[in-house]
Amino acid sequence: RDLRMSRGLGDVYKRQAAERAGETAGYAETSRDFTFNASAAHDENSREVYVLVIGETARACNFGLYGYERNTTPLLDKMEGVVTFTDVLTQSNTTHKSVPMLLSAASAEDYDCLYRQKGIITAFKEAGFHTAFFSNQLPNHSFIDFLGMEADDWKFIKKDAPKGANISDDELLFLVEKELKAGHQKLFIVLHAYG
């Protein structure tokens, strides 16, 4: 009896996984008409540059910027305008769920809104910003890809690398430098680091 019940549950989970895969594949269609109705809050002539770094396996407790006893962030410590978030926890312990929640309004309680809504990159675009998304991860037809590819410029730097290559997150900085030199008055960049 227990074996039959576990097979039945397995079938339920497989069916749910197939349904989710279909819903995910249809993201472009189901979110097409979504809008934030966002607008800029600052003078259009003032330069604004925002960089959101999603550090995957990087741990705040190992950053000097967050009080770690070794100075592991000497350059960040000297920069003006750096904002650290000290009271933030992820709502999921898996990349495929936590990163989309960071890039959107979705939470663990209403994760399904991802199928109908766009992310923070689109909000910045609506507000008149040039947007960029650069990732040191491989694309995998997930919400991370979909939300990232809403940007004006996007690149997954591991995509063209030899299989199994270990690419340093520093490589993302060349893409940031290129965006900064392009002279966009309003710029929002998301870096999805390997950590």
Task: Give, region by region, the residue ranges found by the protein language model.
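Active-site-proximal alpha/beta segments of enzymes that process anionic O-linked groups
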Residues: 7, 11-52, 57-195
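Helix-loop-helix transmembrane hairpins and adjacent membrane-interface loops
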Residues: 1-7
